[in-house]
């Protein structure tokens, strides 16, 4: 018994000793500096991740943009990376190309131009990056490969960069190759040549937006390729790099990272990798996929953004924890600052980085995220331990004379569920060139000489609510601000506002599917085009739309309800699809591909004439009207039980839609 008492006392003393004794860390620029900091950013696209953002009414849309881009307000991002739209499915939808066809150029399609302008308006120094996920079909000459004609691909990409400047006064700083797909050395060299020939010497190339290898090996053995590439960009590197990448002396970036549900564990993931991407892997930029979760949440990777803005119909948005975790770094350091060599891991878990502008300013960011509270979506996270600890930082070199540091703290507090983020504490007085902190687990601290930090706020946005049960759009917009109609989320193909000059009647302004050739794809696009809309929970509803086929004999269009899949799974989407064809037939199918037929027959429909389709789904039965008259009824629908409404075409073909309406009971 006495032995046990002595043991207990000794154990308590040991624990107290471990906690009370502060480990010491030196922050010193005399020993030399580390790598130049290039910034923290967000990625819009790859794909259609900002689709719903553009539909927000003011002031809410501007408030969201302020939280993302406005300096000293929210995330204060240094980098905006966007998809160079390629008319193909690239995760959560398609983004339109500026060149659907070889003789076509339109630099006002989509919303990435607008987003870059808004970012630049708030932060003129923001770095802009463009990267293709897919390419229009003509670039590949009918093959699902962009490198057989590298001169065409290079000219296509460069035209996007030139258009950004000519039409929007946007200087693109970096361009990538082909997101997470094979690179081609010949193409990269030709891209560099084409950029230079076009007066774009300042535009730098990132390669290859995939894994560290094989691009690193290729750079080591091909000097001409090495001369063309400025940044090695890796995706989801797990905070580590490879020796060969370090040997190249190139900038190393985590050019896509995070991709994690933006709850507090997601915030913890972001906190850990923002520090440890440099501590472990010497990566000087980290870019979040995605910038803002502004797409239907039931599409793939719902809420995997720095914040959430998925309800333009209510105006509701949520400033999630990753916004404030970002601010711990972005509000107190800028691209061009330099990491100290004295960065690293804390003895009892966690990490610290320090940056300087070489003009006397110092910013230190500390994170103590535990394993289970910082798991990212990928790669797998090996076990590690973090415990409460005291730490002492000794300021050396040019920092020895610092007398005061501003302090900002975030505490996740998974135990009591009372977290707080980006809280300004009292300034820390420095005594004898050192200071001591008591760190708990799952915290983030910033200590800095910069005094301009601010936790920006706006009045609470409107409360959350479902998509309207009664919805109508006649597309009568003479001068639309964007090329796409609100709330429609294209999943294969591109649906654009169209002025139908051949129809002086009620269908002058329509929505038109415009992609006529399978693109060079990134995901597995459907063979049919489809755009979804509404509430994924919808079960019993009526969908009505006027349709106009533009392909004789083989043309076909549909309206649909209960569509259960989008994104990279769109080919396998099920639902209730009501098709009419230009050969005078109709079909009702339980799937997009059209294999499971629920009803079929003659419709008398032809191309180049308007027809009104009405689909009602109630319980296990579906009924269809053509031009207001019953065409088929009581088709048995065993599943799915719920899903979006949709419109689309039988193939990559031109077709128009007008007066789209939904009336849902649930």
UniProtKB/Swiss-Prot annotation:
Gene Ontology biological-process entries: galactosylceramide catabolic process
Keywords for the protein's UniProt record, in alphabetical order: Disulfide bond, Glycoprotein, Glycosidase, Hydrolase, Lipid degradation, Lipid metabolism, Lysosome, Signal, Sphingolipid metabolism
Record EC number: 3.2.1.46
Primary location class: other
Signal peptide: 1-22
A single GO cellular-component term on record: lysosome
Record field: catalytic activity: a beta-D-galactosyl-(1<->1')-N-acylsphing-4-enine + H2O = an N-acylsphing-4-enine + D-galactose; beta-D-galactosyl-(1<->1)-sphing-4-enine + H2O = sphing-4-enine + D-galactose; a D-galactosylceramide + H2O = an N-acyl-sphingoid base + D-galactose
Glycosylation sites: 125, 361, 385, 390, 500, 540
Gene3D superfamilies for this protein: Aldolase class I, Exo-inulinase, domain 1, Glycosidases
Active site: 180 (proton donor/acceptor), 256 (nucleophile)
InterPro entries xrefs: Aldolase_TIM (IPR013785), GH59_C (IPR049162), GH59_cat (IPR049161), Glyco_hydro_59 (IPR001286), Glyco_hydro_59_dom (IPR035394), Glycoside_hydrolase_SF (IPR017853)
Its job: Hydrolyzes the galactose ester bonds of glycolipids such as galactosylceramide and galactosylsphingosine.
PANTHER family noted in UniProt: GALACTOCEREBROSIDASE
Family: Belongs to the glycosyl hydrolase 59 family.
Protein name in the entry: Galactocerebrosidase
Gene source species: Salmo salar
This protein's encoding gene: galc
